[in-house]
Amino acid sequence: MSAQEPDATAQTAPPELFVLRDQEGPILYAPLGNLIARANEPAVAAALAYAHDPSTLDSMSEDERAVVETLGERGFFKHRAYPRHVVGFRPVQVTLFPTNNCNLRCSYCYAFGGEGGGNGEPLTRMDLEVAQRAIDLIARNARQRMDDGDPVRNFLVSIHGNGEPFCAYDLIREIVWYGQDVAEELGVPAVFNAATNGVLSEEQLDFVIANFHSVNISFDGLPEFQDANRPIAGGRGSFRRVDHTMRRLCEAGMDFGIRTTVTAAMVDRMPEIVAFVAENYPGIEQLHFEPVWECGRCVTSDNVMPRSDVFTQRYLESLEVARERGVRLVFSGARQDMVVDTFCKVSSGSFTVTPTGDVTACYEVSYRSDPRSERFFFGRFDHELGDFVFDQAKLDALSELNVHNIRYCDDCFCRWHCAGDCAAKVLDGIALEEHHGSVRCDISRALTLNQIQRKLDWRPTDG
């Protein structure tokens, strides 16, 4: 099934009713109610007239009235408010960046991993005390929120990085052991996950399999792409090492996903990547495709972002292969099954700690020298106090980074799904009111339309 650029801006109605059009005609879509219906043009005209002014029902024909009443019975005209739940900054999850050192030199790395962010900042690693106090904070919050009746079942420690976190393997072990001790002491389960480039030793693999609940591997899908884009520091290819890691994880039955960064040179082979992954790493949790974003080391390399229309078409072709092979394929901006008001947790106090002890709301903003840190950094670890200090004014400002405040998204049918996209990308150096989207919007709209079309085409099977 091909996707067509939806016409969704001209006809919207007050109760979040959008009219999309594809090659088969109009589609009525109410995202907050997850309601979808194909309709002809007279039905669309009647529905929009009623949505804007219910008194028009009196002057409608019998057929128009029947359409409006049927749609109304199914909830298309119901005014729905997005349920916003504000609990203050009481995180039960933390993402720790153990180090900015890295054993790879990926040609498009947003953080210049292994090179201090590209701004001359030194290679460093997190103090164990910083990690311990972060775990204390989220574990106490989890215990308190569980006692208060909140739907909290555990605390989560994610290992990530502006480098390869397992370059600080001894620190990671101490972090995990400490978290397990705290979990036992407070009676709150601890969950550990990690993002890694997959270049791990046997000892590290044994530890991951024994102690982590899930892992996400950055892997570019085919041996030649992996070796070219993600070489080991010094220039050797990394495919053999990462392939071994993923086969070990498969053998252990461990949940893991693959994140593939797609460049213009790779885009036409996306379906082949899906087939290769399905054949060689059976049972992976998901395969995640993202077009490269031209920042960091990518700016000085030959890698460029694929054209949005080409990425979209190859993604749809890949989706067919994925369905045939039993692979879950995802793109971050296309998630019609989710109703959200923020793309990520940046506006709800995402608690991420950099190697220097700074607290950022965004994985992509991890250095003080990054101009975006003025917006996204909202705290730090104070060694004299032995605890974290947070800037409430910064937290308040971050809480405004949601789709309710993005006028550009008002008339977009994806507004409650992609929710304005990644703030670090689309708000780079500009104010929220200047948000004007990006080429990623074209991809998100086309792929979300495709998800809507698939729901319309779905039929229950016998049995």
Predicted regions and their residues:
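Short Fe-S-cluster ligation motifs
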Residues: 133-160, 435-463
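Radical SAM/AdoMet-radical enzyme domain recognition
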Residues: 131-162, 168-292
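Accessory C-terminal segments flanking Radical SAM cores
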Residues: 12-45, 330-442
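Canonical Radical SAM [4Fe-4S] cluster-binding loop centered on the CxxxCxxC motif
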Residues: 88-89, 93-130
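N-terminal [4Fe-4S]-dependent radical SAM core
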Residues: 3-38, 60-95, 148-151
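Radical SAM enzyme [4Fe-4S]-AdoMet core and its adjacent flexible, acidic
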Residues: 228-243, 247-347, 352, 356-359, ...
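Conserved, mostly hydrophobic/aromatic
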Residues: 102, 106, 217, 357
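Short acidic, hydrophobic short linear motifs in intrinsically disordered regions
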Residues: 46, 50-60
